[in-house]
Curated annotation (Swiss-Prot):
A divalent metal cation binds at D37, E39, D155, D226. It catalyses: Exonucleolytic cleavage of poly(A) to 5'-AMP. Its main location: nucleus. It comes from Arabidopsis thaliana. Its cofactor is a divalent metal cation. It is found in: Nucleus; Cytoplasm. The lineage of its organism: Eukaryota, Viridiplantae, Streptophyta, Embryophyta, Tracheophyta. Belongs to the CAF1 family. This is Probable CCR4-associated factor 1 homolog 1. GO terms for molecular function: metal ion binding; poly(A)-specific ribonuclease activity; RNA binding. Ubiquitous transcription factor required for a diverse set of processes. It is a component of the CCR4 complex involved in the control of gene expression. GO terms for cellular component: CCR4-NOT complex; cytoplasm; nucleus.
């Protein structure tokens, strides 16, 4: 696949929204995978490295409920990696002097070419037009669709907030339930990249696409172009995992142990991409400092004379085989720390508290 020939985003305004909605509905019949991205006026309520999961969710809820969406981008594609179309919807609702915003974020968007005045003058009134309810009617007209994001917590949150008259659920557990109820099967490419050695969760979308040798079409930080990059990254990462069910329902970006329910991870096949994307299949990933991720205590990994991996548990001062580590060692931390598991598949190379968020 040659990304240079991927389509430019179709820009949607008040004047052509009906035509483009019909075009999108027709395209969806053959391209049922939906990558999407949002652009919004920045973060007002911030969290810190040691913020709890509840604090992280409350901050996101406050940010989403108190700001207005500027753009939403959608790329429709299929399991073969073929792109059906790219749409960039501009919304007129942001722009009043009283609208909450982060001025640094607004200047950032302007520097990347967003014409906020044109969007204000010619964009779609998302509430007056009822864009998102109509869009969900289009999506639900198909029996099976899947949604793909990059660091998608805020993307899903804005979508849900608009559908729910500006409000999000009170808890992250209720939020997860709503995501499953409304969207069904969801994937986050930042989570998927965290399973690939040499990629990891520190990468932004543009850098990740560059490492995967994907050529950008359009400008970064425009919702249409970013949704296309998200789709192309997903297609490339699917080459690593023939069965991507292990990443289904994981959303990146809301705290460090946002577990709602942890299904048994699906088996992950051997990868087919270069070493840069090889998985840590044989054991838990060993970071450069010799530690394995654990939200409670880091675990020092060593090997016995036969080469079998063992882990020194700082909490107990004893050695245990990796196959019998507490479930809290996993990216899917257990509600019961004493539980044991036998899964030796890959876990994300996460280094900070923005771990994946399980929504199924």
């Amino acid at each position: 696949m040659n990304e240079i020939h991927q389509p430019l985003a179709r820009r949607v305004w008040r004047s052509n929204v009906d035509e483009e909605m019909a075009r999108m509905a027709e395209c969806l019949k053959r391209f049922p995978l939906i990558a999407f991205d949002t652009e919004y006026p920045g973060i007002i309520f911030r969290t810190y490295f040691d913020s709890s999961s509840d604090e992280c969710y409350r901050a996101m809820k406050g940010n989403v409920e108190n700001t207005k969406l500027i753009q939403c981008g959608f790329t429709l594609f299929n399991a073969k990696g073929e792109i059906g179309g790219v749409w960039e919807i501009n919304f007129s609702n942001f722009g009043d002097p009283s609208d909450t915003r982060n001025e640094l974020s607004i200047e950032f968007l302007r520097r990347h070419g967003l014409d906020l005045q044109k969007i204000r003058d010619e964009g779609v009134d998302m509430f007056g037009y009822g864009f998102f309810p109509k869009l969900m009617t289009v999506f639900r007209s198909q029996k099976h669709v899947e949604f793909v994001t990059f660091q998608g917590a805020y993307d899903f949150a804005y979508f849900l907030s608009i559908l729910n008259h500006g409000k999000l659920p009170e808890t992250h557990g209720e939020f997860a339930t709503e995501v499953v109820k409304v969207f069904g099967q969801v994937y986050d490419t930042k989570v998927m990249a965290g399973f690939c050695e040499g990629l990891g969760e520190h990468l932004g979308l543009s850098k990740l696409a560059q490492l995967l040798q994907i050529t950008r079409v359009g400008r970064a930080h425009h919702a249409g172009s970013d949704s296309l990059m998200t789709a192309l990254v997903f297609i490339k990462l699917k080459h690593v995992y023939e069965d991507s069910r292990f990443a289904r329902g994981l959303i990146y970006g809301i705290g460090k142990s946002n577990l709602v329910a942890a299904p048994a991870p699906a088996p992950v096949p051997e990868p087919t991409l270069p070493l840069m994307c090889q998985q840590n299949v044989a054991s838990y990933p060993v970071f450069h400092n010799g530690y394995v991720q654990n939200y409670e205590q880091p675990q020092l990994v060593s090997y016995d004379p036969s080469g079998a991996p063992w882990a020194f548990c700082n909490a107990t001062g004893t050695y245990v085989q990796l196959t019998h580590l507490p479930a809290s060692t996993f990216a899917y931390p257990s509600q019961t720390p004493s539980a044991t598991v036998d899964y030796l598949g890959p876990v994300p190379n996460y280094y900070n508290n923005n771990a994946c968020y399980v929504v199924e």
